[in-house]
Amino acid sequence: MYAIVMAGGKQYKVQEGATITVDLLAAEAGSEYVLDKVLMIGGGEAKIGAPYVAGAAVTCQVAGHVKGKKIVVFHKRRRKDSHKKQGHRQGYTQLKVTGIQA
């Protein structure tokens, strides 16, 4: 059984036991997190939501918080001997799927 869920404006295909990386959530590591925006449940008889499947939820365990690859933002003003270099690392939350309720 699999489900397509929405988290942070993005869609993810999840199965029980899978680990997904979503944008940073305000949840403690080790706590339980419920994704209730389920767009579709597949495997056997498929259920498609309009826009969400009623009564469906995906429960996850928060595995931890990680940072993505570093990107460099460089602004240069030509002929002015002026520039600004700034780095950024996006925060992500890793979720381990523990159950899918249809």
UniProtKB/Swiss-Prot annotation:
Keywords (A to Z) from UniProt: Ribonucleoprotein, Ribosomal protein, RNA-binding, rRNA-binding
Alphabetized InterPro entries for the sequence: bL21-like, bL21-like_sf, Ribosomal_bL21
GO CC annotation: cytoplasm; ribonucleoprotein complex; ribosome
Pfam annotation, one family: Ribosomal_L21p
Entry function: This protein binds to 23S rRNA in the presence of protein L20.
Quaternary structure note: Part of the 50S ribosomal subunit. Contacts protein L20.
This protein's name: Large ribosomal subunit protein bL21
Species per Swiss-Prot/TrEMBL record: Solidesulfovibrio magneticus (strain ATCC 700980 / DSM 13731 / RS-1) (Desulfovibrio magneticus)
Gene for this chain: rplU
